[in-house]
Amino acid sequence: FRKELTAAGTDEAKLLEAAAKLRNLIMQGNLPEEVETAIRKKYQKLGEHIRVAVRSSATAEDLPDASFAGQQETYLNVRGIDKVLARVKSCYASLWGNRAVCYRCNQGYDQLSVALAVVIQEMVESEKSGVLFTVNPITHNTEEIQINASYGLGESVVSGRVTADSYLCDKKGNLKSCQIGSKQTQIIYADEAGSADTREVPVSTKMQQERCLNEQEIAALCAEAVRVETHYGQPMDIEWGIRNGSVYILQARAITTLKMDHSEENRQVAEYIKNSTIKGKEKENM
């Protein structure tokens, strides 16, 4: 398979053909016995049918400035060990999804230099969630924190499905400016009887027009942001959730470049993939 990828070079059509083969091999195959056993034991310790998020975490040792945000799959509100194991395989397969392969090809990254870990986290049924940057992504002011927030699970904000509230604060948690987004929908847990993991529902007009976060929540988020940034010693991009007044840090990654904010980077990637012609092949969005 490595030979096939190497032979494909930067030819997108050949790369996608090879990637499709690998995805099929992953999905049709079995996880290594020791991996499956470890997952089963840990999941059992969490509790029977506990809800978890199965998240992809891609990296490349030789590409410290690379951003792979949003290129691989994450699954929310997954219940039951069989479904968890299936989602783990889907995460591994998503390293070779057309979106990810096209992104790496466009950026000039070696397809064989990337790796992927899968993280299984107990779900937080967030009432509010979003992302924050411990540096202003527009002005690069390191004394400011940018928070984007909306209702429900964080997928709404991360995927760009909603126009979230935008808060600009100092490192002490003092609000400097706020722009209220429309927040027309939110993503919540799916009904027990349904087959989907999550569902999208409307947000009331009143809640759309209100600020999502209050002063106390903003201060708490900023305090956690500073703590995470101090721990890693560099500006961070953080996904968070709030439930019953408590802040939960769901993901933290270094801001690999301050040339543009990640939302702009992801927009450019999406635009590239949309406009790419792959010799008649219909692109599959894994």
For each feature predicted by the language model, list its residue ranges.
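General beta-strand structural signal in soluble alpha/beta enzymes
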Residues: 53-56, 77, 119-120, 133, ...
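N-terminal beta-alpha lobe that positions the nucleotide/phosphoryl donor
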Residues: 1-119, 208-233, 249-251, 255, ...
